[in-house]
Amino acid sequence: MRARQQLLASLQAIVKDMGLSWPEKATLEPPRDKSFGDLAANIALVISKDAGVPPRELASRLAGALRDSDPAIASVDIAGPGFLNVTYSPDFWRETVLHVEAAGDRYGATAVGAGRKAQVEYVSANPTGPLHIGHGRGAALGDCLARVLRFAGYDVTTEYYINDAGRQMRLLGLSVWLRALELSGRPFTLPEDFYRGDYIKDIAAEMLAKDPGLVDLPEAEGQDRCFEYAMNSIMDGIKQDLADFRVEHQVWFSELSLVREGAVEKTFERLKAAGLAFEQDGALWFRTTTLGDDKDRVLRKSDGTLTYFASDIAYHDNKYDRGFDLVVDIWGADHHGYVPRMRAAVAALGKRPEQFDVILVQLVNLLQNGEQIAMSTRAGQFETLHDVVREVGADAARFMFLSRKSDSHLDFDLELVKQRSMDNPVYYVQYAHARVCAVLRKAAERAIVLPARLDAAALAPLTLPEELDLLRLVDRMPDTLSAAAEGLAPHHVSFYLMEVAGALHSYYAKVPVLNAADAETIVARLALLRAVGQAVANGLNLLGVEAPEAM
């Protein structure tokens, strides 16, 4: 928010001139009641004691200094025990249009990242089956977060961690092998925990078509081949599904590579040297209790097999070796118990808490005709991301996945997101952009010329409360995106777009744009709509959703 940044700079300068430091508890926020002004500041209350002046008296001094320092301020009122309610002039808000025009598709971008290197790891589903809609929510979240961080000045790398080691992968190979035996008429026994989906049979049939002698191989060799083929086949499908969903990973990192290259053992030695790993009962343990975890954790079992935790520590060691200042992991909510031990591991690697964060993604309930669709990868009962994208489109799926906070459960109504109505949030926001484009096209058809660049005088006709409210909303975009980046909370973008779309639709219904009383007002209103459309387009781009020009 340009207004917030401008007011913050003015108040900080005034406080500094008083010989005081700017306190962390100072806030500048829009008041709940718009009649109180554009921004409310509690600074007089917070520094009153240090200044040795009663809050209201101090507020009066600050108000006078503000009026003198910033001609864009229309009024400063003192409320309650000493709050400052600041109102900016209409001219100030009208200048928002000029700022949007100057920035174009970079409007809303900030420099809060200051070029720091960030890595966002997301999806990272075991390559044991197709992606389901829960993975889709994590994919949309991770991709949007990466876009938001880049827009905020971070140097971002996106990454998928391929869990190609461990028991689940051995079970995948066994499952395909047994299906190959079944299809060949050979005797076989299916364990209870094998993967049952039709895709397992399809992979087995594909392998047999290429190599009918597969089932004549020794069992261990046959299972190894089944594992390699199945994993590659499933990963190819995952990559294609993500590409169709407009999700890009720059790095695909293999867990197996950590084991083969000795990275896990290297990490063990590092922990031992720090006194954080110890042998007990034939197993290797990580002393995580000294780092805030509720109990110590096994790294290598007594039979010599590695735990997932062991590979994960080595993987994060590798991340920091690559120079990332910020590492963000996006996990399913069922991994919440894993967070403390991972934080302990990062601390053991010598990293500060602010260099690592985990975003937990809650479950998605897929609804069709009011009925919830059950999902289970191992049982082969699930609605795949591929099926959902094919049915409703990437735009609708991405927006819906990003329409709630990641830690909130999400009901994904397949019928709702296909509706061309204002009840459909995807349609609601996209139609706001399409509506702006339609008005601009009609203006062109009537030979109404909107200059590529306007001056402040041309915007003077924007005097209606609805117009100033729209300008305030557009001005808020940079602050909103900064909050989304700093809080690792991309839902701020979709929430903001819903608010802007609502204000735009309301304005369009109430105010004649092309039928205004004079040409000057028409041009000013068209410029306002163009600025709103640019803000909506920029926000949709951050969500990875198209901004259609017609619907």
Swiss-Prot record:
Which enzyme class?
ligase
Write out the entry's keywords from A to Z.
Aminoacyl-tRNA synthetase, ATP-binding, Cytoplasm, Ligase, Nucleotide-binding, Protein biosynthesis
Per UniProt, what is one Pfam family of this protein? Answer: tRNA-synt_1d
Molecular-function annotations in GO: arginine-tRNA ligase activity; ATP binding
> Where is the motif 'HIGH' region annotated in this sequence?
125-135
Subcellular localization is given as: Cytoplasm
Biological process annotations from GO: arginyl-tRNA aminoacylation
- GO CC annotations? cytoplasm
| Disulphide bridges | none
Q: State the reactions this protein catalyses.
A: tRNA(Arg) + L-arginine + ATP = L-arginyl-tRNA(Arg) + AMP + diphosphate
EC number(s) recorded for this UniProt protein: 6.1.1.19
Primary location recorded for the protein, binned into one broad class: cytoplasm
PANTHER family tied to this protein: ARGININE--TRNA LIGASE, CYTOPLASMIC, ARGINYL-TRNA SYNTHETASE
User: What family does the entry list?
Assistant: Belongs to the class-I aminoacyl-tRNA synthetase family.
Summarize subunit and interaction data from the UniProt record for this chain.
Answer: Monomer.
Question: Protein name, please?
Answer: Arginine--tRNA ligase
